[in-house]
Amino acid sequence: MKKILLLLTLVTPIPALADSIDEILEKIASNNLELQLQQNIMETKQIENKAENVLGDLSVTYSSFYEQGEGSDHGSEFVATQGFDFPTQYLSRHKQAELENASFNMQYLTAKREILLKAQLLCLDIIYLNQEKELLDIRLKNADRLEELYKVRFDAGDANALDVNRVKMERMNVQTLVAVNNAAHRTAMQSLLTMNGNKPLEFSSKEYPQIAEIRDFNALKDEVIDSDPDLINLSYASQAAHEQVSINQQEWLPKLELGFRRNTDNNKAMNGFVVGGSIPLFSNRHQVKISKVEAINAQLEKKDAELHIENSLMSLYNEMLQLKETMQSYDSELMYSSLELLQKALDEGEISIIEYFIEAESIYNKLLTRMEIENQYRK
């Protein structure tokens, strides 16, 4: 479910997210080294993009000429010229650069979304591990109590060695599960720490954040498509491709050149100006046709991405509904109550230790399955 919700959080953050997870994501957004790199790359591309739509360099030439022999004349020529494109071309390139820069920004937001999604899923896994640890603590406490109880019963002759060994093996099994849980928890926290640039983080929540229930798939689909950074990026890229068509069409316009010229000889100096230009008869051949095809391809790519996102969203939505229905079929209160009744029945001698372990193991597994389903649902 979080995969669906995080598609919306970059544009419209969800207020219902728990503060603890919200704070974790905020810190990672500030401290993640990969995000900092992506931001620098984005800013560099934007600067480079703007730098391309400027006047060319000023051209300056100086030449000296003379005749050989006594009393010969000599002279010089100085020329400074500035070439430039037709003014409308600068406007079109500026518009295209703005679209491309917006596309670069969306690419950065896409990278940010993926990193924050990974961090958020880690937080949800840590919540699951904390819940599992809480259940294992209850189970270990019961195992410790049973070990003490059956030690007393064995000494009193009310229990045999086989019963005592069963209790000890149960405790060994629970201790192993606790160790596995602790290792998984440390790994998840270390991954979260790495994503935060190795700056300290604390996260010990055992409760999932409250989230608004999604009821209308069509409304969800429209909101995701309108706010998804991948689609927005493709939209900007499509607009930029169409703008490139206009730019290439204007490449047939002449290149202009204006300048100052000064000629001197023995007796006088003359000042003037230079006007020139070039007509691109061959350099722009087929470029308009190519750019039109690229614009069509960009539009098709956007439509294809919309279909993929819609299908993926439908799959996630159906999976979410199925997981929710399955999760609601488990009655956690009933299972915890059954554990207490089992313990009471064992203490009063109404059931054997074997019957207790068989029933208790079944209940613990059901509780754990319910936790796993909820964890998957929250994702």
Residue positions per predicted region:
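Periplasmic alpha-helical coiled-coil/stalk elements that build and connect Gram-negative outer-membrane
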Residues: 2-3, 114-227, 316-323, 363, ...
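Sec-dependent N-terminal signal peptides
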Residues: 4-13
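Bacterial Sec-pathway N-terminal export signals of envelope proteins
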Residues: 17-59, 84, 92, 98, ...
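Hydrophobic/aromatic residues within transmembrane alpha-helices of membrane transport systems
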Residues: 28, 80, 126, 192, ...
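Alpha-helical structural elements of signaling/regulatory helical domains
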Residues: 30, 86-89, 114, 135, ...
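Amphipathic alpha-helical coiled-coil segments
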Residues: 35-52, 111-138, 145-147, 152, ...
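Small/polar-residue-enriched beta-strand and adjacent coil segments characteristic
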Residues: 58-111, 232, 236-244, 249-306
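Short, charged, amphipathic alpha-helical segments
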Residues: 94, 98, 161-170, 292, ...
